[in-house]
């Protein structure tokens, strides 16, 4: 028997709540805590829409403050060296938007659509290291919100590598075994 699910729910909000919360934070008008409140409200609302629509499996980890590929970069520790020393949302948004010391990561079209994603930057020296905190936190958040049939969404390792660029001429797909080992840990 087939099961219904949504591969990814639009995350910005019907009134573009996430966009406005992020812009206010970036302008220094609000704290990141305010962005987190908006995000929590949106996730809960979106899960409830799916529950009300009788969707069989409710997607979690389909929410992102900026980009799901960027989330995967963080999750698997593929952070370019120029962002060393940063952490938390400073790291996350510096990778996406740049900062005074480092240029932002490149963006390109997701499978020829109008959506742009952050392009992972890999080299022979990349050492993948799983940080599943976002995924686990969102899964627990969904369960606490009453989602009984949660399904984790995640960009797969082949897609991640195929859409990456290398900074040293190496082949991104040469990292498949190492990256897959981190996926297995999930």
What annotation goes with each model-predicted range?
Residues 1-186:
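Domain-level signal for soluble alpha/beta catalytic cores
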